[in-house]
């Protein structure tokens, strides 16, 4: 339903229940859902069963009293055609044709804004995602973070938040020194397996590429930094470090550009040390009595905030453990005015959540408990040519985001090849691959493991979920082109005043009714997905919507001789096309007119 329809109907039900309950009773929020069986109606409500025990009433008898009250409520009149009590106390509702028609008219009138809320109604939110170490290319796990984080940011923006996207670079510590030593070894002509190869060095072929460019004295730059020119001196470890980090940041920028992800800020971990924020956070915790010394180390009393044991902050060698700069970093988020923060990370970060939150509580800055929120995702396995693509950290072999985009794009064109030949609009050459990777990585809940099947991503049939959804959009465009010619979009305004009874009234087919119901669910689906931090729900919805469209297409011919019926069905398709476009926009996938 439209938000105003939902709120009016929910208010009518809430007041009906409130009138039957004791004044001090705590009542659940009234919600509506789609009945499992379409023949049961358009909406179902289980509030009678939820409150029956508290009201000491029989659920079915209570449901009848609620129905009687709602039927007399002016807010429900014009919305509800009939209500029926089913099973142990479900209330099934059938909406009026006028209410259904109002949904279609709203979609056509609001266009690209259907389902969106006014910007700023919720304030600011910072979404941190990807945040890869600049020690290697973006791998498939980072790709899942990019898909989740960017779709979540879009989703929150649609729900009225001012969204800030941030990438946190871990450009300090042992890993960066290991990167520099790895490149230095390659520059000296060493390779993995040699006796003098550094212990724990990075073994990937990309290290050799960095070393070659360093020796050649090349210049590289990241999107937010100054250019860095290699000295070519293999003994200059500082020059190697700066060049290698910037080289890899540039490579990551290229991958993110291919993936269609833009960040508002790149925050460097190293700046937390140079600005004194890490030391300031530690000293504040010490001063507030939140720490103690034991075995030569400084410990944080994280058990005070629910952790299973206290954690080391500063090791006996004087270095900080990895969660300490994270605490300092999150103080900057709070101080910058982001009272809501969401971190999208791999499930291997689960152990840091309690530590970071405990550190923030210990600082006594007014930060609420449970800050920040986390969306954790599980690993991705890649299948290609019917076999699992083997990865090995030790050997330096893994599947990158770039690999997935290129493989899923089809053909032999590569991103590096486009860059080397100066193709200006190169990201557009990889739209198909980008769309497939984004959609696939959102086609499962974040907390479930996922198998990315490259062969499936290349299929052009209904087995491929992104093709299935995009083809629904393209098929609708084809119908409109048959109706209105090349300039059919300019004629869509003609449908605004169409009589919609052929798709909303009693004569409408079951498939038309089902499609209309699905379109009505879009605003509430977005709201629920945002509240649950669950962008996968949008991908799920789009597959269901495409299925409803294809069922309608197979059941009802659109371009019929009866002008009124034709215009009604075209209006339904125009609304369907619009919602497909809007949903795909939320998850960062294109809506092609032809396929």
From Swiss-Prot:
The keyword Cytoplasm applies. PROSITE patterns: AA_TRNA_LIGASE_I. A motif ('HIGH' region) lies at residues 132-142. CDD domains: Anticodon_Ia_Arg, ArgRS_core. Gene3D superfamilies: Arginyl tRNA synthetase N-terminal domain, HUPs, Isoleucyl-tRNA Synthetase, Domain 1. SUPFAM superfamilies: Anticodon-binding domain of a subclass of class I aminoacyl-tRNA synthetases, Arginyl-tRNA synthetase (ArgRS), N-terminal 'additional' domain, Nucleotidylyl transferase. The keyword Cytoplasm applies. It is found in: Cytoplasm. Keywords: Aminoacyl-tRNA synthetase, ATP-binding, Cytoplasm, Ligase, Nucleotide-binding, Protein biosynthesis. One of its GO terms (biological process) is arginyl-tRNA aminoacylation. Its EC number is 6.1.1.19. GO terms for molecular function: arginine-tRNA ligase activity; ATP binding. Monomer. Belongs to the class-I aminoacyl-tRNA synthetase family. This is Arginine--tRNA ligase. It comes from Cupriavidus necator (strain ATCC 17699 / DSM 428 / KCTC 22496 / NCIMB 10442 / H16 / Stanier 337) (Ralstonia eutropha). The lineage of its organism: Bacteria, Pseudomonadati, Pseudomonadota, Betaproteobacteria, Burkholderiales.
């Amino acid at each position: 339903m439209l938000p105003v329809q939902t709120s009016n109907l929910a208010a009518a039900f809430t007041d009906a229940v409130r009138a039957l309950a004791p004044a001090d009773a705590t009542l659940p929020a009234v919600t509506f859902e789609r009945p499992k069986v379409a023949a049961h109606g358009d909406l179902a409500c289980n509030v009678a069963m939820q409150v029956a025990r508290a009201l000491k009433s029989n659920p079915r008898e209570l449901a009848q009293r609620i129905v009687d009250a709602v039927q007399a409520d002016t807010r429900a009149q014009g919305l509800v055609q009939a209500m029926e009590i089913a099973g142990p106390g479900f209330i099934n509702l059938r909406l009026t044709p006028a209410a259904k028609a109002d949904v279609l008219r709203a979609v056509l009138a609001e266009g690209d804004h259907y389902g969106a809320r006014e910007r700023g109604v919720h304030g600011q939110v910072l979404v941190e995602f990807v945040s890869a170490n600049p020690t290697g290319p973006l791998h498939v796990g980072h790709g899942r973070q990019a898909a989740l984080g960017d779709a979540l940011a879009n989703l929150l923006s649609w729900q009225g938040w001012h969204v800030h996207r941030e990438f946190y670079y871990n450009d300090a510590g042992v890993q960066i020194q290991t990167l520099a030593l790895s490149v230095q070894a390659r520059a000296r002509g060493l390779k993995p397996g040699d006796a003098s190869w550094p212990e724990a060095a990075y073994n990937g072929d990309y290290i050799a590429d960095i070393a070659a460019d360093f020796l050649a004295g090349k210049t590289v730059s990241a999107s937010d930094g100054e250019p860095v020119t290699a000295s070519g001196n293999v003994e200059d470890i500082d020059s190697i470090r700066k060049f290698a980090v910037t080289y890899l940041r540039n490579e990551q920028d290229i991958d993110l550009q291919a993936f269609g992800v833009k960040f508002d800020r790149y925050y460097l971990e190293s700046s937390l040390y140079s600005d004194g924020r890490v030391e300031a956070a530690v000293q504040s915790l010490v001063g507030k009595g939140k720490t103690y010394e034991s075995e030569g180390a400084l410990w944080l009393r994280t058990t005070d905030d629910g952790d299973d044991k206290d954690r080391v902050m500063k090791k006996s060698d004087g270095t900080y453990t990895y969660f300490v700069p994270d605490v300092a970093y999150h103080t900057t988020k709070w101080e910058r005015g982001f009272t809501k923060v969401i971190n999208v990370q791999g499930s291997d970060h689960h152990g840091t959540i309690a530590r970071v939150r405990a550190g923030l509580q210990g600082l006594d800055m007014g930060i609420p408990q449970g800050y920040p929120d986390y969306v954790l995702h599980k690993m991705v396995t890649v299948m290609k040519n019917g076999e699992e693509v083997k990865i090995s950290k030790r050997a330096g072999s893994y599947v990158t985001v770039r690999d997935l985009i290129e493989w899923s794009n089809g053909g032999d064109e590569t991103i590096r090849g486009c860059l080397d030949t100066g193709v200006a609009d190169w990201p557009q050459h990889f739209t198909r691959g980008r769309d497939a990777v984004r959609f696939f990585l959102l086609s499962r809940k974040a907390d479930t493991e996922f198998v990315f099947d490259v062969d499936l991503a290349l299929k052009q049939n209904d087995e491929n979920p992104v093709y299935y959804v995009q083809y629904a959009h393209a098929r609708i465009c084809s119908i409109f082109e048959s109706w209105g010619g090349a300039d059919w979009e300019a004629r869509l305004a003609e449908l605004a005043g169409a009589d919609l009874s052929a798709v909303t009234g009693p004569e409408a087919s079951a498939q038309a009714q089902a499609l209309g119901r699905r379109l009505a669910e879009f605003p509430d689906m977005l709201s629920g997905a945002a509240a649950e931090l669950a962008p996968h729900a949008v991908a799920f919805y789009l597959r269901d919507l495409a299925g409803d469209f294809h069922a309608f297409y197979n059941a009802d011919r659109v371009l019929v001789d009866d002008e009124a019926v034709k215009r009604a069905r075209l209006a339904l398709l125009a609304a369907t096309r619009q919602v497909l476009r809007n949903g795909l926009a939320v998850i960062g996938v294109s809506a092609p007119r032809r396929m």
